[in-house]
Amino acid sequence: MCGLRRFPSFKLFPLSYNPNTTRPKTHSAIRHNLPPNAPDTFKDRSVLWNGVELAEKSGNAQLAREIEIALPKELTLEQQIALTRVYIQQTFVAVGMCADFAIHNPPVTDSKHRPIDSEGNPSNDPDKMIFRNPHAHIMLTMRPLDKQGQWQPKSQK
């Protein structure tokens, strides 16, 4: 279902979620951005995404849009979070969209998918691993909220 499997830290009601498709938890905590007119119940992510699913009439409707953005590796995690929040707020939340995001920075791996150190040797020590690809996964609702907190028609942008 539309990328929700990337965010396995919450459970949806059993509408179409498949826990067997989740990925290893290699990301930071999932963060939530809501417009000010969003119902208070949407602060609970499972309520939000179940509401998104229940708002659709068609069984094969697109429920969300996922965007992946690269982040400067020179920034700290806190700075990457702040930068991502500002981008989401100004670009999506300002027009009524609800968003979740998680920041990943997976280690560089060898051909057997084992993390490696700066000399190319397998390493399980996070202090020796190489991290070069910080990025954010942003999941957006397809429908913006109106001023009363009700779903509007889907956004075509």
Q: What is the predicted role of each segment?
A:
Residues M1-K157:
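N-terminal nicking endonuclease/strand-transfer module with a His-rich metal-binding environment
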